[in-house]
Design a protein with these regions (language model features):
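Transmembrane beta-barrel wall of Gram-negative outer-membrane proteins
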Residues: 63-167
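Residues at secondary-structure transition points
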Residues: 36, 270, 276, 399-401, ...
Length: 468
């Protein structure tokens, strides 16, 4: 057919419910020109399902950002693209032009709106091995993530953060090459896939955010122990470096979307989405009213002096200790990423279309580590220290006609760690983020022991498709 329309939906433990629609015209104006119109909406039902059952919880954080409700609002994307095959009368060439608008979220990190256009030249090097060069012009505005700017760049007053949240241009040039030599698209049993990207944004590309970014990933599949038993391995590497700010940004600020994050259903599965790597904690100042300073003096939680409060010794009005659950962890991401996984997939003989999996995921996120893009090269030990983890786990797959429906349980062996804490005060009639001088000894697993404490170390992931 010359026309095709599709509509679908689904859910997972991070994005709640989603729906998507697509319309394709395969011969627009003749010459096999292809027009694609797509739209998707996610985060549906988030307010009602927040923290219910298998779904992730967005904490009701009332500190500076006040953005807990923002993370529960729907996300959406819409795009239109026209693709010209055999461009310049070369059968391996294609040129596409498109426009888009979106409200995207990096879960628990940042929300941003954007709109713009893109131009892409694609050259097919071999079967299932395309290379492309693209330019994407986007006007973006960060909606949430005040603590990100405060801790990462020292910008803590809400007036300056407001300026950073104004519309900025994010306009990179991206070169990409990929190859697919796997035997099946949805559940490979043999072969390999690989992808590499180089990205640059600067004044030359008319971008306010300026950086160099490199990323590569690959997966290898081999049958082991039987026809439907597969050993799958996966590796991800990434580096990004800011190049300085424009007149609008006036700082070496990376867009949060261009930093690297780890943790989640397709990453290190012992952690929730983006929760492995550098993090901070946010805490409403009201919980610091009954705190003390490092010297034991009463804490002043209403002024700049709140920075001297000790977040490890706080109580409520009834003098009961305030637990770790009152602190909200927020991922900062990093400029360097290394991640590796090994997974053994096997059939369950007595249950048709059902399979099991055993896996080990490892990853680390850091700053300027093993840096091929700039100065400040550090060691692998620096990358792993404090920001890395290895998490084992197991899972079940139901092999449906639309792909594997996957349930994974990842075990988190991490212990308590020292994390920076930020809160907010009203200063001269304006809200201001204040980083505390004393870090918090924090454990996302809680302080409980026994069976309950052990079970708290498991992270559940439910999604469609293999992890890689």
């Amino acid at each position: 057919p010359l026309h095709e329309a599709r509509i679908g939906g689904g859910f997972n433990t991070v994005d709640y419910f989603q729906t998507e629609g697509r319309f394709t015209h395969y011969n627009l104006f003749g010459g096999a020109r292809r027009l694609d119109i797509t739209a998707s909406v996610g985060n549906l039902g988030a307010s009602a399902l927040n923290g219910a059952g298998i779904f992730r919880r967005v904490e009701a954080d009332t500190t500076t950002t006040g953005d807990a409700a923002d993370f529960l609002k729907p996300t959406w994307q819409a795009s239109i693209e026209l693709r010209q095959p055999a461009w310049l009368q070369r059968p391996r060439n294609a040129l596409s032009i498109g426009a888009f608008a979106q409200r995207r979220a990096v879960p628990a990190v940042v929300i941003d709106r954007g709109y713009g256009g893109n131009l892409t030249y694609t050259r097919t090097l071999a079967l299932r091995a395309p290379a492309s060069l693209s330019y994407r012009f986007e006007v973006t505005r960060v909606e949430a993530g005040g603590p990100y700017f405060c801790v990462s760049f020292g910008v803590c007053d809400t007036l300056t953060i407001g300026a950073l949240r104004s519309r900025q241009r994010l306009s990179p040039v991206l070169a990409q090459v990929q190859i697919d030599r796997s035997d099946q698209p949805l559940a490979p049993t043999r072969g390999y896939t690989a992808r590499a990207e180089l990205e640059h944004a600067s004044a030359v590309t008319v971008s306010d955010y300026r950086y160099n970014r490199a990323y590569a990933e690959g997966a290898l599949y081999a049958r082991l122990g039987g026809k439907n038993s597969v050993l799958a391995t996966h590796l991800r590497l990434g580096f990004v470096r800011p190049l300085g700010g424009s007149a609008n940004l006036n700082a070496e600020v990376l867009h949060p979307r261009k930093r690297f994050y780890a943790g989640g259903s397709q990453s290190v599965r012992g952690y929730g989405e983006n929760q492995l790597g550098p993090r901070i904690l946010t805490l409403p100042a009201q919980y610091l009213v009954n705190s003390v300073t490092a010297s034991g003096a009463p804490c002043d939680a209403t002024s700049d002096a709140v920075r001297y409060c000790n977040p490890n010794f706080i109580t409520d009005s009834a003098k009961n200790p305030v637990g770790d659950d009152k602190f909200t962890p927020r991922a900062l991401g990093g400029t360097s990423l290394i991640e590796a996984s090994v997974e053994y997939r096997f059939p369950i003989p007595i249950l048709k279309n059902l399979g099991g999996a055993l896996f080990i995921d490892g990853g680390a996120v850091g700053e300027k580590v093993l840096d091929p893009l700039g100065a400040g090269v550090k060691t692998l030990a620096d990358l792993v220290r404090g920001t890395g983890a290895i998490t084992p786990g197991f899972g079940v797959r139901y092999y449906s006609s639309v792909g594997p429906i996957r349930v994974d349980l990842g075990f988190n062996p991490s212990r308590a760690e020292d994390l920076a804490v930020v809160t907010e005060v009203i200063k001269n009639g304006r809200r201001e983020i204040i980083p505390l001088d004393i870090p918090k000894r924090y454990s996302a697993m809680g302080s409980g022991g026994g069976v309950g404490g052990f079970l708290n170390r498991f992270t559940l992931h439910l999604s469609i498709g293999q992890a890689y």
